[in-house]
């Protein structure tokens, strides 16, 4: 029997990488004539433009007690899913997937979990990791971003899983910037420990005296905003550092910058790096597990890879990218992967795996 309705469950739709993937998949599924509903655990504002047929149902906070709140939220998730009567459920990121599998036990609804990070590190709560071991075998399918991430799991789970690239809508990715680039170094992502923005600030503090006309601009929100602001002040670079928050026009604002830097300690397949390269930006990234940046960047060919946490290596990479000739070569080579990364076949692969049928031509 054909699958006609999908429910996607996530934390929120406020602007992170997983949510961007959900927005693009939902719009594609809707264009294929499928019914699509997104359930969010939080009741934050929806950051992405969705097809009018895609509904978003927030759960929201249920209690001031952290444990009770989690239990009540997932009880509500179960109730909402049963009301929607979907043919399948897709959940992401991994922590959400663990608890969705638990909440939907006994419903006989097929649940797919999309791993979005480094499984050696995330989930970062011991109880959730234990539950992952127990619950993942009950999933209908698992979606991994890299072969390295897939290799973490036992053979039995690898057999029911698949590695799928992040879908990218070419219509929302600006083309390569033509003209003299701004003397701005851009970072973007959640202001959390995973992204290691302090590394970026410290490397920039070494770079700035040689390049006083450069600025560092970090887009995103998170719990470390005040800490980063204070660090910039203590490094005497506060007047060259900007933290503008989230932006609905992030890619357009990034595109003319001199370089993009991803300083993370670990990632899955980082959307923002992928999109920066699709725009033909000079890009620097840590060679972080679970291997996403390494699949995108060929060091010294279409960008620069540096060891995780290496401040000196990042500073040296910034100095290399400050050379317009070298940066231009890296940018042009990066731009050549746009066609591969924006291929409609990526959307088709997700559709085939989840719905078990061929999509219609759009």
Indicate residue ranges for each PLM-predicted region:
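N-terminal strand-loop element at the rim of the active site
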Residues: 3, 8-69, 154
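A conserved mid-protein helix/loop that constitutes part of the nucleotide-sugar donor-binding site
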Residues: 16-24, 183, 190-209, 218, ...
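Short His-centered aromatic/hydrophobic patch
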Residues: 43, 91-97, 115
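Donor nucleotide-sugar binding/catalytic pocket of nucleotide-sugar-dependent glycosyltransferases
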Residues: 137-173
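Aromatic "clamp/platform" in nucleotide-sugar-dependent glycosyltransferases that forms part
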Residues: 246, 265
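Short hydrophobic beta-strand element within catalytic cores of glycosyltransferases
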Residues: 282-287
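Conserved acidic donor-binding segment of nucleotide-sugar-dependent glycosyltransferases
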Residues: 296-300, 304-311, 318-325
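A charged, aromatic-enriched C-terminal amphipathic alpha-helix characteristic of glycosyltransferases
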Residues: 325-355
């Amino acid at each position: 029997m054909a699958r006609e309705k999908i429910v996607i469950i996530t934390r929120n739709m406020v602007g992170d990488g997983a949510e961007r993937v959900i927005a693009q998949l939902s719009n594609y599924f809707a264009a294929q004539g499928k019914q699509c509903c997104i359930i969010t655990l939080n009741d934050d504002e929806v950051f992405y433009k969705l097809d009018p047929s895609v509904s978003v149902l927030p759960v929201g906070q249920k209690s001031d007690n952290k444990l009770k709140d989690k239990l009540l939220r997932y009880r509500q998730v179960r109730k909402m899913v049963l009301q929607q009567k979907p043919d399948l459920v897709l959940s992401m990121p991994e922590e959400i997937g663990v608890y969705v599998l638990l909440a939907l036990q006994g419903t006989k609804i097929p649940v797919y979990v999309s791993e979005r990070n480094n499984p050696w590190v995330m989930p970062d709560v011991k109880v959730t990791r234990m539950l992952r071991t127990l619950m993942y075998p009950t999933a209908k399918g698992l979606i991994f971003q890299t072969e390295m991430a897939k290799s973490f799991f036992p053979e039995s789970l690898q057999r029911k899983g698949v590695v799928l690239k992040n879908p990218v809508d070419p219509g929302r990715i600006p083309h390569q910037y033509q003209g003299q680039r701004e003397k701005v170094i851009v970072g973007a992502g959640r202001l959390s420990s995973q992204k290691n923005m302090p590394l970026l600030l410290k490397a920039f503090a070494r770079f700035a005296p040689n390049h006083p006309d450069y600025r560092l601009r970090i887009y995103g929100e998170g719990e470390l905003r005040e800490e980063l602001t204070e660090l910039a002040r203590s490094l005497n670079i506060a007047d060259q550092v900007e933290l503008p928050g989230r932006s609905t026009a992030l890619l357009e604002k990034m595109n003319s910058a001199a370089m993009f830097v991803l300083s993370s300690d670990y990632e899955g397949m980082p959307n923002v790096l992928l999109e920066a390269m699709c725009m033909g930006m000079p890009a620097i990234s840590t060679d972080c597990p679970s291997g996403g940046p390494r699949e995108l960047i060929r060091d010294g060919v279409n960008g620069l890879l540096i060891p995780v946490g290496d401040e000196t290596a990042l500073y040296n990479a910034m100095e290399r990218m400050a050379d317009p000739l070298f940066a231009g070569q890296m940018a042009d080579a990066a731009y050549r992967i746009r066609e591969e990364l924006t291929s409609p076949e990526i959307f088709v692969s997700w559709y085939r795996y989840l719905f078990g049928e061929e999509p219609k031509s759009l």
